[in-house]
């Protein structure tokens, strides 16, 4: 079967929007999804370091348009996107855990739960107790997940994506 790669980071509202629709698109097109958790901060560091300056000194008009555009797309996708109190969030452990979820066959449920926790419930998903709760919600053992995300194999896989 044909497949396509879907790169995403829980800390990105734009990948949350795409995630909310990707499974339906794949089903309609008869393709499989090759899930690729990434750290979008690493991508920014490689291709657009100015993003940090733009965040530190935002232009008010651009910010208003950005928020409006994001909310328009969220309504279109049928999801809620709020303004998390911690943004950007340090999502490295969460994205490593996404690889554990991929191996366990529950990555879509894990990611859906994590996206909603951060963007819908506005929780600080960088905190260990939040990661543990997300794991429990999707049937992953939190202690086992924490052990795996500390290992070199998972770290290397996330860097490779």
Positions of the model-derived regions?
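C-terminal cap of thioredoxin/glutaredoxin-like
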Residues: 2-5, 10-32, 99, 104-106, ...
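Structural alpha/beta surface segment adjacent to cysteine/selenocysteine redox centers
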Residues: 18-118
